[in-house]
């Protein structure tokens, strides 16, 4: 109302329209709308048509007094380290390169890097020579900064509406980085990752570009996870399993294919471990319940409620690892099975200490405490699966 400077404003229309459902009056020929703003603070809207007169009188509200319920700035005391790692609690940044790094979420790279290590170990053909070390580092760059960075950037792009509800101060919804800049980053990271995959195939002497196919398949999976029309993340089960497979199976397969040969038993074992990855992915869903519910995304905390979802989460993580330990025991590898069980126990302790108490408040603390034992368990399984 503060934009109306004249005492009386009158609007006439020239064609027939309708009245919409949100209170906007559309006019037809010979209709008129008169808006009167008085010094008393009251305003009058008069709508007239042949045979009808509609009057609305209301008190004026100063728009400066109406404030959004959602903060449009990052919480005070945000950390610059959190900003660079791409995790919550980040400070707001104006430097474009720091913002670009934030979008790639470097905190998510280590599991992919570790997956390459596990695959190389499972191949049984990795040697501590300069060439093998260089190949493994290049494979880690492909899996971590390039393709995980691509995945995280494209996910943030398609999550911009949810982030506008949950965290409107994040780089994309806040406008700190423009649409063309985001799209450019997506393409640079994707093409960079696929290019490195092709180089690795040539370096390894592959007649079939296995690493390239894995990188291409993983990139496609990342896209349909985040983007419509499929948008796998809309379904808590399918989306989180796809995420788990991306973080555990794909980098393992890439590392093993680079130094050896993928075998059916390893494929099955890593896909089984991806169910644990599903549980890990659910941990991140609790902080987005409000936005997911508003936009109709059926994450497991939305579909089942927080209490049920947190037990599904820990069940997926623990039962999967115990099943793998049972598989190793049945395969005649009792010491590896025992080592894996020893690594599961502290995870259960931290689940009860942090996650099951409050999955929103303690999600970061739980992951920092428990996940090192999970990734060590994956490495133990890789050593047990050496070919």
Swiss-Prot record:
EC number: 2.5.1.62
Catalysed conversion reaction: phytyl diphosphate + chlorophyllide a + H(+) = chlorophyll a + diphosphate
Entry-linked InterPro entries: Chl_synth, ChlG, Prenyltransferase_related, UbiA_prenyltransferase, UbiA_sf
GO cellular component: chloroplast; chloroplast membrane; chloroplast thylakoid; cytosol
Membrane topology: Multi-pass membrane protein
Entry annotated with the keyword S-adenosyl-L-methionine: no
Pathway the protein takes part in: Porphyrin-containing compound metabolism; chlorophyll biosynthesis
Organelle targeting sequence: 1-57
Regions that span the bilayer: 182-202, 210-230, 241-261, 266-286, 311-331, 336-356, 364-384
Residue numbers spanned by region Disordered: 62-81
Molecular function terms from GO: chlorophyll synthetase activity
Expressed in which tissues: Low level in flower buds, flowers, stems, leaves, greening cotyledons and immature siliques, but not in mature siliques or seeds.
Family recorded in the similarity comment: Belongs to the UbiA prenyltransferase family. Chlorophyll synthase subfamily.
Entry protein name: Chlorophyll synthase, chloroplastic
Organism: Arabidopsis thaliana
């Amino acid at each position: 109302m503060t934009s109306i400077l004249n005492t009386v404003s009158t609007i006439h229309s020239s064609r027939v329209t309708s009245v919409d459902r949100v209170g906007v009056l559309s006019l037809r020929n010979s209709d008129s709308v008169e808006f009167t703003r008085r010094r008393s603070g009251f305003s009058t809207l008069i709508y007239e048509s042949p045979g009808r007169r509609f009057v609305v009188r209301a008190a004026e509200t100063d728009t400066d007094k109406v404030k959004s319920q959602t903060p449009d700035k990052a919480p005070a005391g945000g950390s610059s380290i959190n900003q660079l790692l791409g995790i919550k609690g980040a400070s707001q940044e104006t430097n474009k390169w720091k913002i670009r790094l934030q979008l790639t979420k470097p905190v998510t790279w280590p599991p992919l890097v570790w997956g390459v290590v596990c695959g190389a170990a499972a191949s049984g053909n990795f040697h501590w020579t300069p060439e093998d070390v260089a190949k493994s580092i290049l494979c880690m760059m492909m899996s971590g900064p390039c393709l995980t960075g691509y995945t995280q950037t494209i996910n943030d792009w398609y999550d911009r509406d949810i982030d506008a509800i949950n965290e409107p101060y994040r780089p994309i919804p806040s406008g700190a980085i423009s649409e063309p800049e985001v799209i450019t980053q997506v393409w640079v990271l994707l093409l960079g990752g696929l290019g490195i995959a092709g180089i690795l195939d040539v370096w390894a002497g592959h007649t079939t570009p296995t690493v390239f196919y894995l990188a291409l398949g993983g990139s496609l999976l990342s896209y349909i996870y985040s983007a419509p029309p499929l948008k796998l993340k809309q379904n808590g089960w399918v989306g989180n399993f796809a995420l788990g497979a991306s973080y555990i199976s794909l980098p393992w397969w890439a590392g093993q294919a680079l130094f050896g040969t993928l075998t059916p038993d390893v494929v099955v074992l890593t896909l089984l471990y991806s169910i644990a990855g599903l549980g890990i992915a659910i941990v991140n869903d609790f902080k987005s319940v409000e936005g997911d519910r508003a936009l109709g995304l059926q994450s497991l905390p939305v579909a089942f409620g927080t209490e049920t979802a947190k037990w599904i989460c820990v069940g997926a993580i623990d039962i999967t690892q115990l099943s793998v330990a049972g598989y190793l025991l049945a395969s005649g590898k009792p010491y590896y099975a025992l080592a894996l069980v020893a690594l599961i126990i502290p995870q259960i302790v931290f689940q009860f200490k942090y996650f099951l108490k409050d999955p929103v408040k303690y999600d970061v603390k739980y992951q920092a405490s428990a996940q090192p034992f999970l990734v060590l368990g994956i490495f133990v399984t890789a050593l047990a699966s050496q070919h």
